[in-house]
Amino acid sequence: MSLAHGRPYMAIPGPSVMPEDVLRAMHRSAPNIYEGDLVALTDGLIPDLRRVARTEHAATFYIGNGHAAWEAALSNVVAAGDHVLVPATGRFGHGWGDMATGLGCKVEVIDFGKRTPFDLNRIEEALRADKEHRIKAVLARHVDTSSSVLNDIAGLRAAMDAAGHPALLMADCIASLGCDRFEMDAWGVDVMVAASQKGLMVPPGLGFVFFGPRAAEARARMERVSRYWDWVPRANPEYFFQYSGGTAPTHHLYGLRAALDMIHAEGIEAIWNRHDTLARAIWAACEVWGQGGPLELNIADAAHRSRAVTALRIGAPHGTDLRKWTEFQAGVTLGIGLGMAEPGDPEWHGFFRIGHMGHVNAHMVMGALGAMQAGFIALDIPHGAGALEAAAGVMARG
């Protein structure tokens, strides 16, 4: 007998749960894309996106996913033959580096594994060793969705300044924007990329690139930039179609308007605090379960765990078995252990992730944790007692 019939909970790290307000905003007929309400709506999105990113500088959007935002950002500031430095803490660090390689850049990767954050001293040393300042940009993940590590972007800026290096600091906030605290201007970030389907609570299909004055200067020095990826007309449009390089992503814009209204009604500080409390509740439950069984948080140091996603190790085949049980027996879908082992490797089945980003509250998290505990019992997976009480205690204290 399955108990999954009812409203499901997609507890994966994106696409995240879409609020009813977003769905209602998108449920409409096609608008006029040349004049009228959509033009005014889009004009209003830009300052509100800046508020979420904590920047006074340029905000642009592209029809595409986070990978599109990666390429758009790179295409405006680096050319074939340019050097970039990639500190990697999981699958997506390597992914952005691979994209730079595909554009003809010379990529140097510093691999910190999948369980620890950046070692800022090693990055500073690498930049000091670049006496000729060949490195044009440092491509850094704020949060790597695969490993759930949270990196110190403000500390990275300080390390770059200490090295006296002029490289651009480019931050990937695809998993973290609207979930983990991020301060683009205060932290000295030159370029930030994000996407619609995680903390911004909109379906996949919008990529965002924010850039400051140093990045604008780098763009001005470029000999050639793809006409489509060029952020100059998007940031300073003379005509409405230039915002999106052609036909507007109409219904995504309606959804984004509703999502930004929700974000600003709650307040970004309150959103960060909500994500922090819910994440700590999940960690508390997992730590208790781990005291009596194989479950282990992928990131040992809580200071370097994302508040948007939690990666877990449990040993094969328990990860896959638990995911299947919670989905088909309880209606809770957990995330696969993306990038933790190669597909086909038996160890791949020993990892999973919990997404807790965007439109998520206390009862949703407690429900997911309850489903997981039921799965441990049903599958006879050893686990410590008292996990739900530990999570509830965190929520009660706030």
Placement of each model-derived feature along the sequence:
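Active-site phosphate-binding strand-loop segment of PLP-dependent enzymes
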Residues: 118-177, 191, 199
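N-terminal "arm"/small-domain region of PLP-dependent enzymes with the aminotransferase-like
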Residues: 1-36
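Conserved PLP-anchoring active-site segment centered on the Schiff-base-forming lysine
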Residues: 78-94
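Conserved active-site segment immediately N-terminal to the catalytic lysine
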Residues: 185-197
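Conserved C-terminal alpha-helix-loop-beta "cap" of PLP-dependent enzymes
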Residues: 295-367
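PLP-dependent enzyme catalytic core of the Aspartate aminotransferase-like
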Residues: 2, 346-398
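Active-site C-terminal subdomain of aminotransferase-like
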Residues: 17-18, 197-288, 301, 398
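Conserved N-terminal alpha-helix of the aminotransferase class I/II PLP-enzyme fold
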Residues: 25-72, 95-101
